């Protein structure tokens, strides 16, 4: 079971050093935000959110080169003053994937890990699981999933579900409940189904990134509003790694208030 052993090695924080030398972490950082204007500059204990994310990544995965693909000098200045590397990209780019592709024209990495700028609690095991998954020979892209433990989450359209094939590759992503237990709805409560919640962090090969930026949107992406479906619709393969670590993003001021105590506790633990 080589796939399982690779997933377990990533969870345990062990990885081939040669993979690290060819892989970089790039964080797309966009100033505008519909639900929380300038959220990356919002402060927790005097420190902007983007710096909490930057410090977390640097602490959790110091082996990897770390870049920030920014669309504003304001965010760039904050990061540079703290000693982080930035690449200024166009504010007209439509997605984080496009922003990373633009940044890689300068970086020139073979594989890239996309950590969201508004997820300041990303873990080492998540980063390593993404890196292990993108190393699969058939993988064009990688992402993560974690078990769904609540029937409410399974039914929630804001919780994106993913179904994997026997080799750990994505079959489909949906906001709908999948796979749906037609004959026994109690299976939801019994937790006997392999229900997986998609976590929106990704790994890419450089070749895939170059191709993805010129692919047209497909009908599935337009209907579900899920960018990763563009890759599946055009025949690309997405390796889905497993992690026990859930993802906590900041989309609203309320999210930031909820995350703030966790950030401070984690920072105190390191100190």
Predicted feature residues:
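Conserved core of the sugar-phosphate nucleotidyltransferase
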Residues: 123-215
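Hydrophobic/aromatic residues located in beta-strands of well-ordered beta-sheets
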Residues: 25, 66-68, 112, 142, ...
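A conserved hydrophobic position in a structured secondary element of the catalytic/binding core
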Residues: 70-71, 122, 204, 251
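Short, high-confidence coil segments that cap the C-terminus of an alpha-helix
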Residues: 63, 109, 138-140, 236
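Short phosphate-binding loop-to-helix
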Residues: 67, 73-132
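Conserved alpha/beta core of the MobA/IspD/sugar-nucleotide pyrophosphorylase nucleotidyltransferase superfamily
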Residues: 189-271
């Amino acid at each position: 079971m080589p796939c399982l052993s690779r997933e377990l090695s990533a969870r345990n924080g062990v990885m081939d050093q040669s993979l690290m030398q060819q892989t970089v972490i790039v964080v797309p950082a966009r100033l505008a935000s519909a639900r929380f204007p300038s959220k990356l500059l919002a402060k927790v204990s005097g420190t902007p959110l983007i710096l909490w994310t930057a410090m977390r990544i640097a602490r959790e995965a110091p082996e990897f080169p770390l870049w920030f693909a920014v669309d504003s000098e304001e965010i760039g200045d904050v990061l540079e003053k703290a000693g982080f590397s930035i690449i200024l990209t166009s504010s007209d780019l439509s997605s984080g994937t496009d922003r990373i592709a633009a940044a890689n024209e300068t970086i020139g990495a073979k594989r890239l890990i996309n950590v969201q700028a508004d997820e300041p609690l990303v873990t080492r095991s998540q980063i390593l699981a993404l890196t292990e998954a993108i190393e699969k020979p058939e993988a064009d892209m990688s992402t993560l999933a974690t078990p769904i433990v609540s029937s409410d989450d399974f039914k929630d359209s804001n919780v994106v579900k993913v179904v994997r094939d026997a080799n750990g590759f994505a079959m489909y992503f949906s906001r709908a409940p999948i796979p749906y237990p037609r004959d026994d709805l109690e299976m939801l409560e019994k937790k006997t189904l392999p229900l997986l919640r998609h976590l929106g962090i990704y790994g890419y090969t450089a070749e895939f990134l170059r191709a993805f930026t010129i692919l047209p949107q497909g009908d599935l992406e337009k209907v579900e509003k899920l960018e990763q479906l563009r890759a599946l619709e055009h025949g690309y393969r997405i390796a889905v790694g497993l992690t026990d670590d859930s993802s906590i993003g900041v989309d609203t001021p309320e999210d930031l208030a909820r995350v703030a105590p966790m950030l401070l506790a984690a920072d105190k633990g390191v100190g």
